[in-house]
Amino acid sequence: MKVQELREKNLSELGKELLSLRRAQFGLRLQHRTQQLANVSQINKVRKDIARLKTIIREKTGQL
């Protein structure tokens, strides 16, 4: 996910994307706990995507 693409979206789309990423993160953690996840680095990628998305949301709401 590119930062430029995120900046073009509005707040409602960003909120939906955040919810989707959090669900994906939960699923990956569950797979990791049950030893079904082969590529553990996916968890870190999703975590960083969530942080990136939250930063963009804060920029748009004027909190940064």
Curated annotation (Swiss-Prot):
One of its GO terms (molecular function) is structural constituent of ribosome. SUPFAM superfamilies: Ribosomal protein L29 (L29p) (SSF46561). InterPro entries: Ribosomal_protein_uL29, Ribosomal_uL29, Ribosomal_uL29_sf. CDD domains: Ribosomal_L29_HIP (cd00427). HAMAP family: Ribosomal_uL29 (MF_00374). Belongs to the universal ribosomal protein uL29 family. This is Large ribosomal subunit protein uL29. It comes from Nitrosomonas europaea (strain ATCC 19718 / CIP 103999 / KCTC 2705 / NBRC 14298). The gene is rpmC.
